[in-house]
Amino acid sequence: MLISYKWLKELVDIDVPSQELAEKMSTTGIEVEGVESPAAGLSKIVVGEVLSCEDVPETHLHVCQVNVGEEERQIVCGAPNVRAGIKVMVALPGARIADNYKIKKGKIRGLESLGMICSLGELGISDSVVPKEFADGIQILPEDAVPGEEVFSYLDLDDEIIELSITPNRADALSMCGVAHEVAAIYDKAVNFKEFTLTETNEAAADALSVSIETDKAPYYAARILDNVTIAPSPQWLQNLLMNEGIRPINNVVDVTNYILLYFGQPMHAFDLDNFEGTDIRVREARAGEKLVTLDGEERDLDVNDLVITVADKPVALAGVMGGQATEISEKSSRVVLEAAVFNGKSIRKTSGRLNLRSESSSRFEKGINVATVNEALDAAASLIAELAGATVRKGIVSAGELDTSDVEVSSTLADVNRVLGTELSYADVEDVFRRLGFGLSGNADSFTVRVPRRRWDITIEADLFEEIARIYGYDRLPTSLPKDDGTAGELTATQKLRRQVRTIAEGAGLTEIITYTLTTPEKAVEFTAQPSNLTELMWPMTVDRSVLRQNMISGILDTVAYNVARKNKNLALYEIGKVFEQTGNPKEELPNEINSFAFALTGLVAEKDFQTAAVPVDFFYAKGILEALFTRLGLQVTYTATSEIASLHPGRTAVISLGDQVLGFLGQVHPVTAKAYDIPETYVAELNLSAIEAALQPATPFVEITKFPAVSRDVALLLKAEVTHQEVVDAIQAAGVKRLTDIKLFDVFSGEKLGLGMKSMAYSLTFQNPEDSLTDEEVARYMEKIQASLEEKVNAEVR
C-alpha cells in the first residue's frame, strides 16, 4: 500500500524525516518497502502560461509563446491539447526530467524551442494513473498557478510516498485511518481525523429504494441516494492525492469512492440511479446461466457461488469485485446510489480468483474491513460528493442486515506478560501501551481486561496482547538471554542420510535434480500408480492444474521433460526427491500419509555419436543399472518382476521392484500412448518408496576386515528354455546354499538355430572366496556340483 506522507501528517501531528518513520514502522511490525518522492531527480521545471499558440503548417506541431515568470519563451510543442490561456509545466533548458534526461535549447523543423512543455509521463508519472483527459497530451495546471514557480507543489510531486508491505494479519493498516492509529501509537500522539458534515433533505431515501439480503455471505448492506449530481473532474488536490496513491482520477463521484476506500479502508461503489429498472436492491447468490457485463466491458458468466447485487432481480454488480456497465456513472449521471457493505471474504476471493479480477476493493474484503465505520464511511462519501458535485443527499440510510460493532474483550495478567516477554514491566507500563493504542483497559496487575476496538479485528486472544505490548514497548528494549540448555552433537537423521546417499548415486550417474509441483490435476495425480488412493483436493485451488496432491512424482517430471524437449533439449536425465501423498481415509476428515519418494526419468542418448563410437540410446537396462548401483550402495538385495498392471507404462518393459514381500517401486518405459499425450520421445522412468527403503535398512557395519586370501572364479554356460529369466537363474544358484559364493555375473546370452527352437544359452561367472583361508580346487569343485544340481532342479538347466 502507498502512503502519502503529506496526508499522513494531516492525520497525526508528527514532523520526523520519512526515512526515520519508515524504520520505526518496520521495527514495530509493519514492513516498509521503501520511501520515494515523485520529484526526485527532477529540476528546473516551472509553471508556464501559454500566451499564444500557432499551428505549424502541415505538421502536428504548435509554436507557443510561454510566460515562465521573468521572461517570455518560444517553445515548440506537439501536444494536441495545448492552447493559449492555459497554465502548463515547462522544463527550462538545463532541466532534468524523467530518466535523468536533460533539456537543451534546440530547433524543431527549423523553429527555435527554448524549453519543453511537459506531460505527466515526461515527469516519470505512470501512465496508469494519469487522468484520461491528459493521457495523450500535456498536463494543464490550476488557473491560480503562478508562472515561474516550481510546479511540484501544485501537483504534490514534492510529497514523499511510503510503500508498505501489509501482512494478512494487519489488514487494518490498509487504510489511512489504520496507519494513522499505528503511527500515533508509535510516537504517542493523538489522531486528528477529518469531520465530515452531512446535510440531508427532507425527502427520505427509503421512499425511493429498498434493500434486502438473501444470503449469509453479506452480513450488512447500506445505501444512500444523492440527487442533482454534477459529474465533473475532481479538484486538483484530490487528483494529486489519488495519483500519489497509485489510482487514476476518473471524475468527482468515482474519485470520492476511491478516496473513502483509502481513508477508511471501506470499499464503495456508485450506481447511476436513473439506469435502475426497479427500486429494490437485493443481495443474493447468482443463478446458473446468469451473465453480467462488468465495467471493463467484458461479459461474465456467473457462477452459483458468486455474490451479486441485483435490481429488479437482474444483476447490476459483482459484489465486492466490480460493478456492472449498465449502471456505470457517466457524464450524464445526475442521481447516484452510494453503496457500502460487508461481504464474506472467502466468497469474494473465490469470485475474483475465478474471473481473474483483482482490485483494491476485493483485496480488502478478502482480508477484512472495519465493520464499525461502514455507515461513517458512507456518510463521509455522501458529504464529499455534496461538496464537490453540488449534490443533495436524501434523508437516511437504506440498509439490511446487522453489524456487531462492540469492542472485543481479551484478558491477561501482568505475570503472564512478563513471563512470555522476559521483561519486568509494571502495570503502569502496560497501561501506557494500551492508552497509546487507543484500547480500553480495566483491572489491575493480577488480572486486567483490554477492550479492543473493532478497527483491530486481528486481536482476539491473549497472545495478541503480548505482541502489541512488545511492539509498542519496543522489540529492541526486550532483554536478551541465551538458551539454558546443554549442547548436543549434531548429526543427520536416518532420512537425511538416505537422501544424501540417493543424491550421491543419482548425480554420480549424471542425473540432474529438479523440484516439481506437489499439486497437480486429478488425472495426473493417479498416473503411474497400480492402486490409486483417494484424492486429496484443495477446497479453494488457485487453478485446476494445481488442485490435487500428487500420488506419484513421475507425471511432474514428465512435464519438465516435455518442456525441455519442446525447446530442443532432448538428452535428459532428471531426478527428484520429494513426497507423494496416500489417502486411505476420508480426505475431508483425515490427513494423507506423506511418503518420501525418489523418481527419475531418462530420455535421449547416453552417449552421442562421434568418429569412433556409435550413439548409445537410453534403454531399460541403463535405467536398471542406476537402481542396481543404488541398491548395492544400500546393501539391499531386491528382485525385479515383470508387470503390466501400471497402465501408464509399457506392458512389456516394466518391472515391479520388491524386497521380500515389500514392494519398493517400479521401473519401466513410459507407455507410447502416454508419451504421445506428453509429447515426449521414448522415456524410461523409475520411482522408489524411500520410506519403505529406510525401514528396511540394516545398521551400518562400522568395519569389515578385507580378506588377505584370493578369490576364485569359475565360468558356467547353461542351456535353458527361452522363457527362463536371469533372476530365476540367480535364485537357483543362491538356493544351492554355497556360503563362499560372493558374486554372480551374467556375461553372455546367446540364442539361435544351433541351440534348438525355444532354447537359449546364458553364461555366468561365479566368484568364491573364503575370508579365513585359501580355497582349494576340490572345495570349488564341490561348490560347483551343488550349484549345478540346484540349477538342474530349479530351472531345468543343462550345463554345456
Swiss-Prot record:
<feature type="domain" description="FDX-ACB">
    <location>
        <begin position="707"/>
        <end position="800"/>
    </location>
</feature>
<keyword id="KW-0436">Ligase</keyword>
<dbReference type="InterPro" id="IPR005146">
    <property type="entry name" value="B3/B4_tRNA-bd"/>
</dbReference>
<keyword id="KW-0820">tRNA-binding</keyword>
<dbReference type="InterPro" id="IPR045864">
    <property type="entry name" value="aa-tRNA-synth_II/BPL/LPL"/>
</dbReference>
<keyword id="KW-0030">Aminoacyl-tRNA synthetase</keyword>
<feature type="binding site">
    <location>
        <position position="464"/>
    </location>
    <ligand>
        <name>Mg(2+)</name>
    </ligand>
</feature>
<keyword id="KW-0694">RNA-binding</keyword>
<dbReference type="InterPro" id="IPR041616">
    <property type="entry name" value="PheRS_beta_core"/>
</dbReference>
<dbReference type="InterPro" id="IPR004532">
    <property type="entry name" value="Phe-tRNA-ligase_IIc_bsu_bact"/>
</dbReference>
<dbReference type="InterPro" id="IPR005147">
    <property type="entry name" value="tRNA_synthase_B5-dom"/>
</dbReference>
<dbReference type="InterPro" id="IPR005121">
    <property type="entry name" value="Fdx_antiC-bd"/>
</dbReference>
<dbReference type="InterPro" id="IPR036690">
    <property type="entry name" value="Fdx_antiC-bd_sf"/>
</dbReference>
<keyword id="KW-0067">ATP-binding</keyword>
<dbReference type="GO" id="GO:0000287">
    <property type="term" value="F:magnesium ion binding"/>
</dbReference>
<feature type="binding site">
    <location>
        <position position="467"/>
    </location>
    <ligand>
        <name>Mg(2+)</name>
    </ligand>
</feature>
<feature type="domain" description="B5">
    <location>
        <begin position="405"/>
        <end position="480"/>
    </location>
</feature>
<feature type="binding site">
    <location>
        <position position="458"/>
    </location>
    <ligand>
        <name>Mg(2+)</name>
    </ligand>
</feature>
<comment type="similarity">
    <text>Belongs to the phenylalanyl-tRNA synthetase beta subunit family. Type 1 subfamily.</text>
</comment>
<keyword id="KW-0963">Cytoplasm</keyword>
<dbReference type="Pfam" id="PF03483">
    <property type="entry name" value="B3_4"/>
</dbReference>
<dbReference type="GO" id="GO:0005524">
    <property type="term" value="F:ATP binding"/>
</dbReference>
<dbReference type="Pfam" id="PF03147">
    <property type="entry name" value="FDX-ACB"/>
</dbReference>
<dbReference type="GO" id="GO:0006432">
    <property type="term" value="P:phenylalanyl-tRNA aminoacylation"/>
</dbReference>
<keyword id="KW-0479">Metal-binding</keyword>
<feature type="domain" description="tRNA-binding">
    <location>
        <begin position="39"/>
        <end position="152"/>
    </location>
</feature>
<dbReference type="Pfam" id="PF17759">
    <property type="entry name" value="tRNA_synthFbeta"/>
</dbReference>
<keyword id="KW-0547">Nucleotide-binding</keyword>
<comment type="subunit">
    <text>Tetramer of two alpha and two beta subunits.</text>
</comment>
<keyword id="KW-0460">Magnesium</keyword>
<dbReference type="InterPro" id="IPR020825">
    <property type="entry name" value="Phe-tRNA_synthase-like_B3/B4"/>
</dbReference>
<dbReference type="InterPro" id="IPR002547">
    <property type="entry name" value="tRNA-bd_dom"/>
</dbReference>
<feature type="binding site">
    <location>
        <position position="468"/>
    </location>
    <ligand>
        <name>Mg(2+)</name>
    </ligand>
</feature>
<keyword id="KW-0648">Protein biosynthesis</keyword>
<dbReference type="GO" id="GO:0009328">
    <property type="term" value="C:phenylalanine-tRNA ligase complex"/>
</dbReference>
<dbReference type="InterPro" id="IPR033714">
    <property type="entry name" value="tRNA_bind_bactPheRS"/>
</dbReference>
<dbReference type="GO" id="GO:0140096">
    <property type="term" value="F:catalytic activity, acting on a protein"/>
</dbReference>
<dbReference type="GO" id="GO:0004826">
    <property type="term" value="F:phenylalanine-tRNA ligase activity"/>
</dbReference>
<dbReference type="GO" id="GO:0000049">
    <property type="term" value="F:tRNA binding"/>
</dbReference>
<protein>
    <recommendedName>
        <fullName>Phenylalanine--tRNA ligase beta subunit</fullName>
        <ecNumber>6.1.1.20</ecNumber>
    </recommendedName>
</protein>
<dbReference type="InterPro" id="IPR045060">
    <property type="entry name" value="Phe-tRNA-ligase_IIc_bsu"/>
</dbReference>
<dbReference type="Pfam" id="PF01588">
    <property type="entry name" value="tRNA_bind"/>
</dbReference>
